[in-house]
């Protein structure tokens, strides 16, 4: 299967291990990824607030590249996924904005037609690779690993954007855990916000917010946490020492990127998946 691939900014900077592990796992799964080196940031959520026309153009440009090549666009970041889906909807509903965006894209020989398909890597795994094929490809079952899923909010809300995720109470990561042999831990914070965008102005609030989620996961038996978003990973992993100080209790929960978890089950090593780049180390009983 051939896919246009958009890693986003974090996976090429603070979370380079996410980009590297995605490429490794994609090759193992037989996915061909076409990456657009000139692709820019989608604008996070901040550019939309101050320069909405730029927000539309940034995202439509990347969508237009994938359209030009006739490929679905695969993402590995929740916020990037939401931005693309927002722009698809906004331009479908506003013909004048659509025309202005195409006027801007014309200078580069691009045109956005509105036919773009966006797929987060999680959806590719469960919908395109599929449960049966994944089970066949597993070389090292993650038996004995009790893992909590942390979805974050941008991959589940607003529900109207998501055909795959049709509510806040989805179970896709838990289904994937089961396929890979791990046991899923249920807890209250699994679909809540990670506080990444709050941390820029109110870091203390973000630390308290997410510390509560991680403590709840650990209290319910989690030995590690898997997340499909690098922004969530950044907060859950790098702020964990501050959370421990705030909670006055140790957490020590390794935070694993989605493709790293899949890669372990496919037989790749922790070193190959660059798990040593994480702030919180983890030795997995597999």
Please describe what each predicted stretch is.
Residues 1-286:
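Iron-sulfur cluster-binding electron-transfer modules in prokaryotic oxidoreductases
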């Amino acid at each position: 299967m051939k896919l246009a691939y958009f890693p986003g900014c974090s996976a090429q900077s603070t979370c380079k291990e996410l980009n590297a592990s995605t490429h490794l796992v994609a090759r193992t799964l037989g996915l061909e990824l076409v990456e657009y080196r000139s692709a820019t940031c989608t604008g996070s959520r901040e550019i939309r607030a101050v320069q909405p026309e730029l927000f539309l153009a940034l995202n439509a440009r990347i969508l237009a590249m994938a359209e030009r090549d006739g490929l679905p666009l695969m993402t590995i970041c929740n916020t990037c996924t939401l931005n693309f889906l927002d722009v698809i909807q906004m331009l479908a509903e506003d013909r004048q904005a659509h025309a202005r965006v195409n006027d801007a894209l014309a200078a580069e020989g691009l045109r956005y037609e509105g036919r773009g398909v966006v797929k987060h890597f999680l959806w590719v795994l469960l919908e395109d690779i599929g449960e049966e094929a994944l089970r066949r490809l597993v070389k090292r079952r993650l038996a004995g690993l009790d893992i909590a899923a942390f979805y974050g909010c941008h991959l589940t809300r607003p529900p109207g954007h998501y055909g795959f995720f049709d509510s806040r109470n989805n179970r896709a990561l838990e289904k994937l855990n089961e396929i890979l042999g791990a046991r899923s831990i249920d807890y209250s914070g699994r679909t809540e916000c990670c506080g990444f965008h709050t941390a820029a102005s109110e870091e203390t609030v973000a630390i308290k917010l997410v510390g509560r989620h991680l403590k709840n996961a650990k209290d319910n038996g989690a030995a590690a946490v898997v997340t499909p978003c690098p922004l969530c990973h950044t907060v859950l992993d790098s702020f964990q020492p501050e959370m421990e100080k705030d909670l006055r209790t140790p957490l020590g929960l390794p935070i694993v990127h989605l493709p790293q978890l899949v890669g372990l089950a496919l037989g790749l090593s922790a070193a190959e998946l660059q798990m040593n780049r994480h702030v919180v180390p983890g030795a997995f009983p597999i």
